[in-house]
Amino acid sequence: MNKLALYCRIGFEKEVAAEITDTAAERGVFGFARIQENAGYVIFECYQPGEADRLAREIPFTQLIFARQLVVVSDLLQNLPTTDRITPILQKYQEVSPHLKLQQSSELWVETADTNEAKELSAFCRKFTVPLRQALKKQGWLNFKQIKDSGMTLHCLFVRSDACYAGYSYNRNHSPYFMGIPRLKFPTEAPSRSTLKLEEAILTFIPREEESKRLNENMIGVDLGACPGGWTYQLVKRGLFVYAVDHGKMAASLHETGRIEHCSEDGFKFQPPKRKKADWLVCDMVEQPGRIVALIGKWLSNEWCHETIFNLKLPMKKRYTEVRRCLQKLADELTQSGLKFRMQAKHLYHDREEITVHVRTWRH
């Protein structure tokens, strides 16, 4: 098993390929990406044995922008007999078991890519999971009961009913969600579906145990381009008082909470009220990414807030290059301002032609 499978949104295979190629090269690992347009995944094949496993351990999954999941995989197992698909899969795992501690595996995910064609396999995958899990357990695998983060998950990525990649991921360095997709339910009281973007961002960027410390009723938030209030809703739900900045109308349900002040202003010109620095800034404005980065840089450099989640709308071409350029520009500005910071960006499931960025700053 010397390949990586990286799941993604369809149409972003080239960005995933460019990112994993660059990230691997930074660690002295070289290979080539196999891209199939609109496949919903990319296969990165390493030149040297053992390097896919090394990348799966060493590349911080949280620093990959466009990948939803990171899995070490076998060659594609093709022409699996319909009467016995399990034996060839078991054989692949048995080949690597001498130098891989499969006894530390805790879960099995039989998955497909997130495409309409692949989803037709989802019913098959659910049914196949049970007998495959039983067969793997008979080998002494999938019984790991210790701290989940220290084990591994076994994956079978089916591309057809008779073809799959068998592999594994490290629990401490992967997406904890099946297919790399968090299943969020749209709250009926939210003003717009965009609310799911911020909910997923909070889930992705802020550890669950820290959420109540980092987002609570003692804090002030600013939402630039707030109308009708999908993102404001997520902050208000967590107790923040929010300055909702937009010329458009906010949902009446948010006014009724008493936790917002609607500022009918241009988001690019708004500044926080004097002596009331915001704790949080959120922004989901449809604007060129360069302008948004300059705006966020101004807020953070002036210390008008110390934590932010914002979206960057991507151009039609050279999306990966533009993302790298924008994030580097923001990082340079924060460094020149003498701020320490942590920055993370992700192409979330609820994002489309955009990525979501989280930045937290401090002085010491």
Swiss-Prot record:
UniProtKB keywords: Cytoplasm, Methyltransferase, rRNA processing, S-adenosyl-L-methionine, Transferase
Pfam families referenced in this protein's UniProt entry, alphabetically: FtsJ, RlmM_FDX, RLMM_N
Organism expressing this protein natively: Actinobacillus succinogenes (strain ATCC 55618 / DSM 22257 / CCUG 43843 / 130Z)
Chief location of this protein within or outside the cell: cytoplasm
Transmembrane helix listed as a keyword: no
GO biological process: methylation; rRNA processing
Keyword Cytoplasm: yes
Protein task: Catalyzes the 2'-O-methylation at nucleotide C2498 in 23S rRNA.
GO MF term (any one): S-adenosylmethionine-dependent methyltransferase activity
Name this protein carries in UniProt: Ribosomal RNA large subunit methyltransferase M
Known catalytic reactions: cytidine(2498) in 23S rRNA + S-adenosyl-L-methionine = 2'-O-methylcytidine(2498) in 23S rRNA + S-adenosyl-L-homocysteine + H(+)
Protein family per UniProt: Belongs to the class I-like SAM-binding methyltransferase superfamily. RNA methyltransferase RlmE family. RlmM subfamily.
HAMAP family: 23SrRNA_methyltr_M
Binding partners and assembly: Monomer.
Domain of life the protein comes from: Bacteria
Binding-site residues, S-adenosyl-L-methionine: S194, C227, P228, G229, G230, D246, D266, D284
Localization (cell): Cytoplasm
InterPro entries linked to this entry: RlmM_FDX, RlmM_THUMP-like, RNA_MeTrfase_FtsJ_dom, rRNA_MeTrfase_M, SAM-dependent_MTases_sf
GO CC aspect terms: cytoplasm
Documented EC number(s): 2.1.1.186
Catalytic residue positions: K313 (proton acceptor)
